[in-house]
Each structure stands twice: as structure tokens, then as C-alpha cells.
Amino acid sequence: MSFLEDLELNFAECIQDGGKATLGVRQREEMDTTHCMKQNEIISQAVCALLNSGGGVVRVEIENGDYNFERDGVGLNLPPLFRNHLDEMLYGKLFLIYVSSWDVAASHVRLATLCSNLYHRCGTFTEVMDPEKALKFLKRVQDPRILGDSDSLNLQEAPVDDAQMILASDLFHSPQLQYLEKLNFTKSSHVEFQMFSADLSQGIRERLPKCVSALANSEGGYVFFGVHDETRHVIGCEKEKINCTNLKSTIDACIRKMPVYHFCGQNHKVQYELKFLEVYDKEALHGYVCAIKVERFCCAAFAKAPDSWEIKDNNKKPLTANDWASRMIEINPDLSSFPQMIPWKSMLNTTPCSKTVFTHKYLKCVEDLQKDYFPVSPNRITYTPESVYKDLFADYRGLRNLINMEMRCFSQGILIFSHSWAVDLGLQRRQDVICDALLISPNNVPILYTICNKWDLGNRHYSMKVARTLKQKLVNMGGYPGRLGIIPLVLPLGSHQRVRNDLEMPVYPESYNFITTQQVEALLQSLVIILFGFRPLLNEELNLESETVALLSDQQYGLLSTNLSKHREMFVHGLPGSGKTTLALMIVGKIRNVFNCQADNILYICENQSLKRFIVRKNVCQAVTRKTFMKNTFDNVQHIIVDEAQNFRTEDGNWYAKAKAITQRARDGPGVLYIFLDYFQINHLCCSGLPELQHQKPLLKLTRMLRSGDNITSYLQDIMHQIRENPPPNVPQEALMVGEELEWGPDVTGNLEITDNLNLEQMSVYVAEKCQSLWRSGYFTDVAVLFTRARDIEKCRDKLLLAMRRRSMSQLAEEPSLLVQVREGLDSLGSHVVLESVHRFSGMERSIVFGIIPMGSETAIFYNALLCLASRARTHLYIVKVVF
């Protein structure tokens, strides 16, 4: 086996090829300069890409066979800022550079960058901005109120040298110049002199973008090609050597090619004016000076794309100017409209790919979750989770002894079992694998044990893939900034066992060993973010520029960590706002990975069209309403998820019996049938088709109401009390005996207003004025106007539209962003006002909800409908009782 193949097989890392290189300080000094720089460039780009993508290894083939690491040194000229993230080691005939992730907090910038290619004028010189200065410049341009460094002027206030600019302008408009004429002004922050090079076009391409970028990013100015930069003598280019038409085309193409980044919504390039000034030697035309007037650019002008790289599809790719600039200035998302969510980890203090992590203020923080689920005990190896490893030890004879034998080499740490770490990470499970266990121990590199029926190359590759994915997620999602490697190790169980080949164990530098308990706990906290973290629906609903990660509750995580292979059927009773639909989608993803099935093998069933369309957009499974389900056969379906099941009916047949039959028909075992419901939110008095409560087994309850602010949640509890006192006749009383009393913290969140006895006109004005006030205060235009009776939408639509339009138009001139759309239904997400019936809005949510309730309309399910309506609101709930 070659060293390259051996490296790929043994290291669970993103490995980038650094090409061939001569190593050694003296040896590289003796190399051809161009060749030396090229080798350095290839290696630097690979290192940069790994820094921005979670780390990895750069492999370099050593060209000089007599190279000795201890004697010769390395000699590579890598950027100083990169060196703190690098370790080096020989591996046979390869030189390995171990790259840890870029540390955003330590470097103060989001991305590792070789060169920003963003220039500015520093006195009379053109200089490239280092990444930190480039970030400050971008922030100043984005918001002129932000002041720069003491040595860097605010772009909006920097004075222009009027005298120099006037003289430069006079020269630019001169009818002709004299050969060797000495100009009466010097280079300045707004004037640049350049001599023509022997190759006119090539010289322009190399030097002009830097000059134009620097001037455009300042206050504008002039570049004169053909003027000596020290003596100020006019030289020009001899007329025989210049073709003005061709050179004009070269200059135009050069400037048009320069990348720009706009904050202002425009898309124009750098504006300039070009003239060729005639230069005379006495009376004869000698040549030309090329004069370029550069206008000040509104935002940021790059000489070329930044020299910054990332890993995409396992290959290094350059970042575009747009991607680089937008990621550099990326900040934590504004979730002021969600006061119940608090930031735990800022994206500005972690790694380049990580996102801001939010937790619910009444849930455990990451540190507490880590101590509960992954405790680190001194002087012992802790096995966890108890339910998982005991289940595995009971099912697989010899597994306990195998694990205990392996742990004899370690005195302290934590061994985390999983039925499949692949599934936990969003990968497909390998059927031959019994389980995985992750060991994190002080003074060692973490080890991922893959226990399988036999050792083979397929299981080895599987273990490698899982270990590599885990490492990447710990860094890129969990935000772990330290040095990290994970060693994959396959352990066969039973008669196929063989002695482990230690050659399979990759070697990491000593700096990759965990030294302290604090390091172990920091990694475990990143692991908590991976296992408990999910992408909340508000990312897409509100089109947030920066994505966020939210954390599951204990109850939600308990459901998601259920072993689907053993628990194929489940009834999940969840209170309003407990995350039922989000969990249903996550269960769909887990089914696909556990059973290696496709989207068309999984069916999601709900009662209303709006929720169905919402799920269809996710493109993770089939989604239909109950009525459609009863009309079709679904031959490919193996697994079924039912959501909002309390609102199902039996008028079209026994849906539960049909779903049960579909999931039981496979020869290789039953499929998954998970049913989510909330009896509190039932919207009819008919038979739901659900089994009797005593037959709904196994049953799991979600009692934490997490969606809404405190005042709204308190209101929901009051309504639930009314429902318990007066339950609908088709709801079992014992099903309503769930819930919990919540204790509010000092900062009570959520806004609740109840208004009575409004007519249609007053109601329309009330809604429009409240929306206008909220939007002026900075809240998202994320509004639903919900009606307890669908027929009332038609009565109110025109009056609501007119009232909203009047208030939007009245302030359009001063605040055009407040002009919003009013729509019926939920065919699209985004910033608009939705008019819908509460029954059709079941399973959905909005930040701001207006509930339109007819006066005197109480029925047997009045409080159920009111609960469903009120629980749609995250932060603002307005109950409006209307006289129709």
C-alpha cells in the first residue's frame, strides 16, 4: 500500500494535497524563487481552506530524498497568523501539516485570509488592508456612524486636499503636455504616478486594479501612467509603442473585472474616466500619458477576489468577493422579537462555519446539559447513556467484556454509546454495525469505536466517515476551536474477532491530546450542541441573514433519541408550543437514516392544506391530507408520521387502521408509525378515529410549552384549565390531565391584549394601527390574522386591506420598508400579513397574532379553538372580540 493510500485509509480527516515540495531552510533558500513561491502558494491555499472549514491535514510529498526534519528544518513561508493553528510531522515519505480550525475570537475576524485584495491609500502609497483592517473598513462603509482606528479617517468626514486635487484636475484636462516637463504637484493620497512597463497591457493588468481599488475606497482621485513617480517628470509612452484604442479596451476590461461588494442595493461597478494626454517633444508628438480619473466608490472595491479559500465537496475552492465580505461582516442575528430565546454562544467567538446558538430561557443551558448527560468523573471511565449501553449489553453477548477489555488502557474519561453515531450525525446507518461508542479521555485523542459483526473494509470506511463527520460537526456546528482529531477503530464481536492492527491507528501530534478536564468538558459541550441542536423554523420564516441553532428540551431529546428499530409505534401527546411539528420533521430525517429509505417511502399526514404545503416544501417525504390519504393506496410507503391527529375524522373511513396496515405489511418487519396530537386543540365534536386512550401505547408526553412568551403561555394555561373544567364530549377526561405549573423569571416576556365589542370598522383600524406601531418599533412583518370562523374572513377582508393600505401609504414616503403585503393562506413564507381560519392554521406559528372572535359565539369547543388560536403566537397576541 502506498503512503497516500495508507493516509486516506487511516486518518478521519479532510486531507488536502499540498503537492510536491523541497523542504529545509537552506534547501529552499537555494531554490528558484518563482518555483519556491509557487510551492508555498499551493500549500498556503490548502492550509487556508482547512482553517476556514473545520481543520484537517495537508499532505506534502517531499522532493529532496536526503531531507532530515531535525537537521534541515522546514523552510516553508506560511503566514504568521496561521502558524498558531499548525503542527507538523513526518509520515513516511510525506510531510504532514495538521491544521486546526481558525479561531474567530482570537483573530477578531471570521475568516482566515491570505490577502484581502482590498486596497486603500496610506499617505502617498497604495497598501493592501490586512483582514482586520478590511473588516473595520467594511463596517465603516456599511454604517458610516462607526468610527475607524485613530489612524484611519471616517470615509464620510475625511478632508480632501483641495489644492492637490485642483492641480491634478487641471492636468487631467490639459490639451497637451511637454516631454520631461516637471509637474507642479506631487503624489498624494488622491494622486498616483506610475511609469509604463515594457509590456504595456500586462503592466496595466498587474498595477491598475490596486491603484483603482485604493482610490475608489478612499475619496477618489487620479492615476497618471507615464509620469515618473519620484522626479514628477512627464515621460509618457512613445507613440510608436502604444495603441490607444487597444489600451483603452484593456483598461476598461481590467476595471470592469474588479469585484465590488454593495451594501446599498446597487450593482454598478467602479466609475472612471479615461483620457490619453498628448506629450510633445518641442513641436513633435512624442507619445501619450494615460490619465484615469477614479470616482469614489459607494461601498467596497476589490482589486481582485480575496485570496481566501474553503473546502467544498472535499476540494479547496476560492471564496468570491461577495461571499468573503458577507461572511466577514456577519453578526449575530437580531432575535429581539423572540425575548424568550437567549444566546449561549456567539458566532463571533467560535469557528468560521459555526452559527449563533440560542437556548430557551427556561431550559437548561449547555453546561448543565453536559453535566447531566455527559458527566466527567475523576479517576474512572463513565459509561453513558445508561439506558443505551444496558440495552446493548443485554442484546449482544460478549459486548460488555469486549468494551471492558478496551477500557483497561484508560484511567479516566467518558464512553458515550449510541445505537448508531451515524444516525445521530445525519448519516445512514450501516446494517452490519451493532453500535458505536465515543471515548473522550484526558491525555488521549478521542476514539470512535465501531462494533460490528466482522472486520471488513466496508466497516472500516464507515467508521472513518462517521469519525470524520463527527469531528467536522464538533468544530463547525458545535464551535469547538481547539485542536481535535478522532481516531476510528473497528472492533469485531464474537467469532470473527481478530487482534487489532495498531498500524490502523493514526498518529497525531501531542498537542492533540486533551490535557485537562476543562478541555474534555469544552468538547462535550460542543457535543451537546450537535445532539440537541436543530435549525429552528424561524430561520426561513423570517429570512434571517444569519442562521441560528436552537437547542431541544430534555423531553424533545428523549423522543428523538428513541431507538426506532425497537419502538416502531409511538403516540406523542404534546401541549401547545411543545414542538410537535418540528419533532415530526426530525423523526422523518431519522427514519430515512435508520432504515436507509427514500423520501417516497415516508408519508406525513395532516388535516389541513396549509400544513401539508409547508411540509412539501421541505422535500423530505411525501405529505398529504387525511382525505387524500383515504383515497389512495401509497404502495411505496413503509413509514407514516401523523400530525395534529386530534383533528382527524372518520367520515372517509378508519384512517388509523389503514395507516397501521400500511406500516405492518413489509416482510422484513413493521415500519414506523408515530402519531402526534394534542386533545386540548381539537376543533370538532366528531369521532377522531384515534384508539381509546388506554390503547395508545407506548405514549410519550411533551409538557413544556416553549413557543410563546410568558404572558401568552400563562393565558394558555388559563384556557387549558377551562377546557379541563368543561371538556368536549369526544375527548377523554384523563387525556387532559397533563401540564405543569411554570415559574416566571424576572424578565417576563410576551404581550397579551384582549379587546371587546368592536365592530368591523373598529377592528380593522385596531389591527392596522397595532401593526404599524409594531413595525415602527422594529418587529418583523410576521403577522397572522386568524378567525375562529372561516366565513368571517370574507366579511373582514376588504375592510382590513383598506385600513392596512391607508396606514402603509401614509408613511410610505418616510418609511417605504413598512409597505407590506396581505395574503390569504400559507403558500409562501416571508414578511407579510396572513389572513386565515384558525383550523387551517393548525400546526403553524407567527410572532404576532390577531385572533378575531365573534361575540357570543361560545360552543362546546370554543375554548379549544381559542387555545389553538392563542398558541400560534410567539411574542404578541391580540384577542379581538367583534360584533358581526
From Swiss-Prot:
Pfam families named among the record's database cross-references: B3R (PF17057), SLFN-g3_helicase (PF09848), SLFN_AlbA_2 (PF04326), SLFN_GTPase-like (PF21026), UvrD_C_2 (PF13538)
GO biological process, any: cell differentiation
Keyword annotations: ATP-binding, Differentiation, Nucleotide-binding
Membrane-spanning parts: none
Parts forming coiled coils: none
Superkingdom of this protein's organism: Eukaryota
GO CC list: nucleus
Protein function: May have a role in hematopoietic cell differentiation.
Protein name in the entry: Schlafen family member 5
Organism: Mus musculus
Gene responsible for this protein: Slfn5
